[in-house]
Amino acid sequence: MPRRREVPKRDILPDPKFGNVEVAKFMNVLMLDGKKSVAERIVYGAFDQIEKKAGKAPIEVFSVAINNVKPVVEVKSRRVGGANYQVPVEVRPSRRLALAMRWLREAAKKRSEKSMALRLAGELLEAAEGRGGAMKKRDEVHRMAEANKAFSHFRF
């Protein structure tokens, strides 16, 4: 964290094909070693697959999937009197989006389809329907928060 002044957030340019900032952000999450063209190919390939399989607009499927996977609450560790408590806290909007994208990426990586584009398409379609690995992760985080509701008075 900087000591002098707050570092301004950089604006992300929308992606070239759909003109959507969230898609561009997701490409950045997927990107490895600065290879943006590879990330673009994966995302656009996944969108083509979504259009073939579902027959819906891929942008709509993507935004529904992202909104379904976004967590509302999570737990943070808080040390009180020699004991660590998992305290449920509300997730701020920017972190919600970041977590949703990260979980979608990880769930897609764990799938068994041949190419990453196919895996991502499958995961996005499942997340849009409320199933899949990313949704499982979101539900797990929500369950943890629900189980530790008793410690919610230890706010940060």
Curated annotation (Swiss-Prot):
InterPro entries: Ribosomal_uS7 (IPR000235), Ribosomal_uS7_bac/org-type (IPR005717), Ribosomal_uS7_CS (IPR020606), Ribosomal_uS7_dom (IPR023798), Ribosomal_uS7_dom_sf (IPR036823)
Gene field: rpsG
UniProt GO BP: translation
Stated family: Belongs to the universal ribosomal protein uS7 family.
Name the UniProt record assigns to this protein: Small ribosomal subunit protein uS7
Gene Ontology CC: small ribosomal subunit
Subunit structure and binding partners: Part of the 30S ribosomal subunit. Contacts proteins S9 and S11.
Record Pfam families: Ribosomal_S7
Organism lineage: Bacteria, Pseudomonadati, Pseudomonadota, Betaproteobacteria, Burkholderiales
